[in-house]
Structures are given as C-alpha cells and as structure tokens.
C-alpha cells in the first residue's frame, strides 16, 4: 500500500513537473514557473508592464487620430472660410485616416499584445483588406491634394473654372475606387493564405510576390513619384513668381520716380509728397478733366468685378497677368512692359482720365495719400475721401493669395516629408521580405513598430493642418470653445 501510494505521488509530481515547462513555453517565467499575464481570460504574450505601456501608447495614438480627423471634417463643414470646394479633398483624406483609426488600429493593438489571432479567418481577411484600402486611400488623397494645388498654381484662371464640385467629387470617387481595385485582389484568390485557419495561424498581409509588387506600386511608389514631381514643379513655379514680382517691383519703383518728377509742380516740396492728386482742389494745378460718363463707369465697375472674381477663384495669379487683367480702360498711359507690371509695388496709383492721362497720387506715407495743401492760396475746401482703385484692391488680394500659396506649398511639403518618413520603411519591408529567405525576416516587434509608424501618419495630418493653416487653427479653437 505504501509503495503504491508513493508511486502514485511520484507520478503526480512528474506530471505537474512536465506541465510547468509547457506553461513556460507559452510565455510564463521559466525560472519561477509563473503563468503569463492574461486579460479577460486571454493569455498575453508580453509582460504586464509592457502590456500597460503598449496599450496606453497605442490607445493614445488612436484617440489623437480620431479626434484630430473629426475636427478636420467638422471644421470644413462648419467654418465658412474653409467651406470651399478644394477642401473636400482634405475631408476625403480625413475620412480615410479616420477609418484607419476605427477599423484597423484597434485590431492591431489586440494582435500586438496577444501575438495570435483570435477573431477568426473572416474577420482576419476583412481586417487586412480594410488595412490596405484605408491606407491606400489616405496616400492617394495626398496625391490628389498635391495635383489640385499644382493646377491651381500653374493655371489659376482656367483651373478656377474647371474646379467645380462635380469635378472634385469625381476625383475623390476615383481615389476610393482605385484604392478598392488595389486592395481587393486577395479576397478573390490572389494570395498565399492557408486553406485552414486556427489560433496559431498568423493573420498577416499576403506575401504572394506578384501581388506585393502590384499593390506596393499602386499604393505607394507611383503616388510618391507623382507627388515628388508635382511638389518640385510647385516649388519652381513659386520661385518664378517671386522673381517676377521682384523685377516688377524694381520697374514700378523707377516708374514711380519718373512720374513723380513729371507731375510735381515747383511750388510743392519734394520731401512732402511724390506727386499731387488730380482729384483735390489746388490753385497750382490745372482743372481736372471731366469725370467719365455713367455708362463708362458702369462698364468699368462690371469688368472690375469680373476680374476680382477671377482673382478670388484663381487664388494665385502671375504678377504680369494680374496687372494686365486688373488695370481698366482708365489706366495710366505707359509702355506695354510697364503696364504689365504697374500694380506690383503696392503703392496707390489712381487715374481719372478718359482721353487725357493725368498722373495721380503715388505715395509712400498715409498722410500724403490725400492732396497736400501746402502753398495753396485759396481757402481750404473739404476733400472727399478717395475710393480705392479696383486694380489696387485686386493687387492686395493677390499679395495675400501669394502668401497663402507659399504657406500652402510649404504645408504640402511638410505633409509629404512626414508621409515619406512614416510609410517608406513599411513599404520597403513589405517589398523585401517576400523575396528574401526566412533568415532575413525582421522580428515581430520590429514589424509592429514599422507598421505603427505608418499608422501614425494618419494622426499627424490633422496636426500639420492645425500648426500651419490659420483657418484650420481658428476653426479648431472655435469647435473646442477656445478664446481666439
């Protein structure tokens, strides 16, 4: 009896000793024999401290992505300065980034902590398809935004007419349709997924070499090439416009001095003003010419309104084009080259002639924008406030538009730089791994880090808009009820 009991006890001890290494292999402590951490009965593959750090960090990224992109969408639809047709591209980008945060990231958090897929093969395939679809849509939307900016800068007048809501929505639909064409082939058989799926089967993107080349070209490398070429062209165009503006400014400065020398009478001190307005009452000046007829003023006003609208829609016009299109029939009679660059320097230059050209105020200081009354022998008479000339108003709008376009190009460059830093490591790994032997495959932690580096791009886009775009910054503050 004693011998049998001892044998039974030894067998029980042996079986328990055999179970301990199995627990250690699953993830427990081989030295202490402790069981691995678990959450809701699901055994985790990493220590508890790593679970806490990973869960908090990745959840924070998800939260930032959701909040930021929701604010972008709400800003465009609720803040009037942002309610313009080209911002629908940004809405589409925000929706793509939002779907990454809602449909893709949470499953990856669970997969990172558990290190095995417990949601079944159907959910696995749908998750992988959504991953490729949403990330590709985000990248292609960036490409569409770059193209839209390029056309707006290089061909502002024509593209302002072509940039209709229907055209923009068609481009956005094309972006999502192309993303679906790139992401869907694995669902219809272009994959190397196993026929049977269990808890130990990894849920990962297919490594079928043909599809890897196809999807990487469509999702990343071709859009990257297009965006690089487009941004270089935008940079060159912006530099060219700045050089044209600098040349026009020098030419206009010389013209201003020449016109001032011809228009200033000897009785007016040259240090007080550079020229004298033809619309004020001075005994020293000849009587002003008759004002234009009502019919001519009506036509001029209508034409100027159209030019102003074209400038507003174009948002970035060549300096020579602006001056030529903005100057009405009452412009100063100068040479053709000077006429093209007249409105570039920012000085007030108004004219009131119909058949006879009269030079008017070209001043540097606010006090000399009205006619000086020094040396006048007649009693002072009230001076009516002078209306701002149309082409000066349009020139000011173009100066603002130029500043906006420079900021937009800079923002686009930053978005592209962040995009390359975030996604290039992932797609290099995605292309290289299927063509190398198993020994060159990266560790699961490195794969997870590179994957999340790509996901972070969806969180950074709204942050970039907030920092570098004043309208988005104001809209965010308004939505969050911050005082501006």
Curated annotation (Swiss-Prot):
Q: Where is this region: Disordered?
A: 253-322, 350-383
Q: Where is the composition biased (Low complexity)?
A: 350-360
Q: Which residues are glycosylated?
A: 13, 198
Q: Which parts of the chain does the record assign to the membrane side Cytoplasmic?
A: 78-87, 148-167, 238-411, 471-484
Residues in compartment: Extracellular: 1-54, 110-126, 191-215, 434-448
Subcellular location(s) per record: Cell membrane
Per its UniProt record, what Pfam families does this chain match? 7tm_1
Q: Which UniProt keywords apply?
A: Cell membrane, Disulfide bond, G-protein coupled receptor, Glycoprotein, Membrane, Receptor, Transducer, Transmembrane, Transmembrane helix
Q: List where the protein spans the membrane.
A: 55-77, 88-109, 127-147, 168-190, 216-237, 412-433, 449-470
Family assignment? Answer: Belongs to the G-protein coupled receptor 1 family.
- State the PANTHER family in the record: ADRENERGIC RECEPTOR-RELATED G-PROTEIN COUPLED RECEPTOR, TYRAMINE_OCTOPAMINE RECEPTOR
Q: What is this protein called?
A: Putative tyramine receptor 2
What species is given as this protein's source?
Locusta migratoria (Migratory locust)
Give the gene symbol.
GCR2
């Amino acid at each position: 009896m004693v011998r049998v009991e001892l044998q039974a006890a030894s067998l029980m001890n042996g079986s328990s000793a055999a179970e301990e290494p199995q627990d250690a292999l699953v993830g427990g402590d081989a030295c202490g024999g402790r069981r691995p951490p678990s959450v809701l009965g699901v055994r985790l593959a990493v220590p508890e401290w790593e679970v806490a750090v990973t869960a908090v960090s990745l959840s924070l990224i998800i939260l930032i992505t959701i909040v930021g992109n929701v604010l972008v969408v709400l800003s465009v639809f609720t803040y009037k300065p942002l309610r313009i047709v080209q911002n629908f591209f940004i809405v589409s980008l925000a929706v793509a980034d939002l779907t990454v945060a809602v449909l893709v990231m949470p499953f990856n958090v669970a997969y990172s902590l558990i290190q095995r897929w417990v949601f079944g093969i159907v959910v696995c395939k749908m998750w992988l398809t959504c991953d490729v679809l949403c990330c590709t849509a985000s990248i292609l939307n960036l490409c569409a935004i770059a193209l839209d900016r390029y056309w707006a800068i290089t061909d502002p007048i024509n593209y302002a007419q072509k940039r209709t809501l229907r055209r923009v929505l068609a481009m956005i639909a094309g972006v999502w349709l192309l993303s679906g064409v790139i992401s869907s082939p694995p669902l219809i058989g272009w994959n190397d997924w196993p026929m049977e799926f269990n808890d130990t089967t990894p849920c990962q993107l297919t490594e079928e070499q043909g599809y890897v080349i196809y999807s990487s070209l469509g999702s990343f490398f071709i859009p990257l090439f297009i965006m690089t070429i487009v941004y270089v062209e935008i940079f060159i165009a912006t530099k060219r416009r700045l050089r044209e503006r600098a040349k026009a400014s020098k030419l206009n400065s010389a013209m201003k001095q020449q016109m001032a020398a011809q228009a200033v009478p000897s009785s007016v001190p040259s240090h007080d003003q550079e020229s004298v307005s033809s619309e004020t009452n001075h005994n020293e000046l000849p009587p002003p010419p008759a004002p234009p007829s009502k019919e001519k003023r009506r036509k001029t006003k209508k034409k100027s309104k159209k030019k102003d609208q074209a400038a507003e829609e174009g948002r970035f016009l060549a300096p020579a084009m602006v001056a030529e299109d903005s100057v009405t029939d009452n412009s100063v009679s100068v040479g053709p080259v000077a006429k093209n660059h007249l409105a570039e320097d920012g000085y007030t230059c108004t004219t009131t002639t119909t058949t006879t050209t009269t030079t008017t105020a070209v001043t540097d200081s606010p006090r000399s924008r009205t006619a000086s009354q020094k040396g006048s022998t007649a009693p002072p008479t009230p001076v009516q406030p002078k209306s701002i000339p149309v082409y000066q108003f349009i020139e000011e709008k173009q100066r603002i538009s130029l500043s906006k376009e420079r900021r937009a190009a800079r923002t686009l460059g930053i978005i592209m730089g962040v995009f390359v830093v975030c996604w290039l490591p992932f797609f290099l790994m995605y292309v290289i791994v299927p063509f190398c032997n198993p020994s060159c495959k990266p560790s699961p932690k490195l794969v997870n880090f590179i994957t999340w580096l790509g996901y972070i791009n969806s969180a950074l886009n709204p942050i970039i808009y907030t920092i570098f775009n004043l309208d988005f910054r104001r809209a965010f503050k308004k939505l969050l009820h911050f005082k501006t």
